[in-house]
Amino acid sequence: MDQRPELLSSMEYVASPDPKPGVPLRVAENVAPGAEDWLPSASGHLAWATSLETEHQTHLELSEEQRLQISKELVDLQIATHHLREQHEAEVFELRREILRLESRVLELELHGNGACQGHKVQPMANLGQHQVPPLEPPGGQQKLQEELKWLLEHHRARQQALETQVGVLSQQLQGAREEARTTGQQLASQAMVLASCKGQLRQAEAENTQLQLQLKKMNEEYAVRLQHYARETVENASSTNQAALQAFLESTLQDIRAAHRTREQQLAQAARTYRKRLADLNQRQELLLTTCRATFATAINLEPLPMHWATELSHPRENEYGRHRTLLLYPEKGSGETSKENKSQPLALDTASWAQIQQRLQDFSQDTQAELERERAQLMVRATMAEQQLSELQEYVDQHLGRYKQEILKLRKLVNIGDPQGVEAVSSPGSGGARL
């Protein structure tokens, strides 16, 4: 019962794809130039997409835990089967040694009996009454040994049947574990289909978000035109007596712009923290995956060689055993030589062939597992590099906008301190940029 391919098939599902950490940034890149200033208004759609990704990522993590648990159960079943086989082989060896001891005892008694019979024939008939040799062996000694040998054979047959029953139960459990692994694979495939459909919905939501951002841009341009018009009217209607009211209006406008800038900074800082957290989570999951695969592979390597063709080994040796013992009972001298030759040649050839085949399978399994781990490590490294690039771009984006906001605030402060009513027209250009936020 070779279970190495099943171990390989159960490990093929260790790795699963994560939602790409660059989705929020891709939404910002699809917007027309200058549209990144309107991202706060689309936070609801972005939060919905993020929650959808988190939910499906949780399902994928659960399926990974199920696959690891099934792989562990398969390895435990294989170890239990191996221990049972070792116990069976030890009992068979003890029984064979006991049979050989009894065979040697029978041969020894037969030789003594034959020698005693020949000695009695040579002696004169006159000395039979004076000096009679006592029999060396009781009349029923050989029959008793044969009965004991038959009892040992029956006991061995019963033990072998019990071990076959245990092996059958373990085989059924292993088949159930394989069915469970197949069911888990089907569930994973269905979850992958659901994830693909959710990705389609996410792309549709991104398209809708882009359209909403374009509409927001048009509305901001319209409001900027209105603000410019209202500023001109205010300058035209302002007089020396209304200078204080104009300054109060400019102060309130400046406070609104500062509040918008502060909100924008908080949103960008939150996005940067989210990217850092996702990058750390990705690195942690990579380390956990590599550790789990390494532990499973080490457990598989530490297993001792198992005998091949177990079903054939359970059926044919029994018939050979009965034939050999029948030969021993009928021809004791012929049976002892054949028994010693079989015990020396057959296990040695079987162990050598089994060990060579298992060593080849372990080597193939190690090469395939190593190649798969290398591919997965390369993919994770690429994803980590992409996440770092996106994080650096986001940091640069935050620094650039903070610098621009500071320049706009300085310009507005200069205009308020000067108190020039004609400078209100210059407020329209930075004010429109603040309104877009």
Curated annotation (Swiss-Prot):
Instruction: Write out the entry's keywords from A to Z.
Output: Cell membrane, Cilium biogenesis/degradation, Coiled coil, Cytoplasm, Cytoskeleton, Membrane, Sarcoplasmic reticulum
Family in the record: Belongs to the CCDC78 family.
**Protein's organism:** Mus musculus (Mouse)
Q: Which GO terms describe its biological process?
A: cell projection organization; de novo centriole assembly involved in multi-ciliated epithelial cell differentiation; skeletal muscle contraction
Gene name, per UniProt, is Ccdc78
Q: Where in the cell is it found?
A: Cytoplasm, Cytoskeleton, Microtubule organizing center, Centrosome, Centriole; Cytoplasm, Perinuclear region; Cell membrane, Sarcolemma; Sarcoplasmic reticulum
Chain segments annotated as coiled-coil in the UniProt record: 83-114, 147-287, 360-408
Q: What is this protein called?
A: Coiled-coil domain-containing protein 78
Disulfide bonds, paired cysteine numbers: none
List all membrane-crossing ranges: none
Please give the InterPro entries that the UniProt record associates with this protein. CCDC78, DUF4472
Question: One GO cellular component from the entry?
Answer: sarcoplasmic reticulum
Sum up the protein's function in the record's words: Component of the deuterosome, a structure that promotes de novo centriole amplification in multiciliated cells that can generate more than 100 centrioles. Deuterosome-mediated centriole amplification occurs in terminally differentiated multiciliated cells (G1/0) and not in S phase. Essential for centriole amplification and is required for CEP152 localization to the deuterosome.
